[in-house]
Amino acid sequence: MHETRDGVVKHVGQVEGVEVPSGTATVRQVLIGPEDEAHNFFLRRFTMGEGGSMPLHTNRVEHEQYVLSGAARVRIGDRVHEVRAGNALFIPAGVPHSYEVIEPPFDFLCIVPAQPDAVALVELADPERS
């Protein structure tokens, strides 16, 4: 990593990946975060392998995402989108969203505000129980 008074430069290979607890075959790297003294935004990279998924959930903060490789079905609210390398996504705060890999590795950058976040899993109503 190369640090200067004016910023931080690092290679993705220098950043430890951490399994996403609620995900399947999903790793998150915080490329730019609080330890880098970023005050407005954090930059994260997610890599999802074969069979990778993240369940329907909400976040307290919005997400801006850019797909680097692979393809996935991404649910945002009530709509399902098939996204692939080159697609950009905006997920507003509080909107339920999920991911299901269809072409691994599904690799994307995710920018979030430098604010406290909370993740909440969303359960869908079971029509059999209604």
Whereabouts are the PLM-identified features?
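A short, N-terminal "cap"/entry segment at the start of jelly-roll beta-barrel domains
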Residues: 1-40, 124-130
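Conserved short histidine dyad/triad with adjacent acidic residue
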Residues: 29, 44-59, 93
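A short hydrophobic beta-strand segment most commonly corresponding to one strand
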Residues: 45, 90, 104-120
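Well-ordered beta-strand scaffold positions
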Residues: 46, 71, 79-81
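A generic "binding-loop/recognition-motif" signal
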Residues: 52, 60, 79, 95-96, ...
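Short beta-strand His + acidic residue motifs that chelate non-heme Fe in jelly-roll/DSBH
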Residues: 55-56, 74-75, 91, 97-103
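Glycine- and acidic-residue-biased ligand/ion/polar-headgroup-sensing regions
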Residues: 61-63, 67-72
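Short acidic-glycine-tyrosine-enriched beta hairpin
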Residues: 78-93
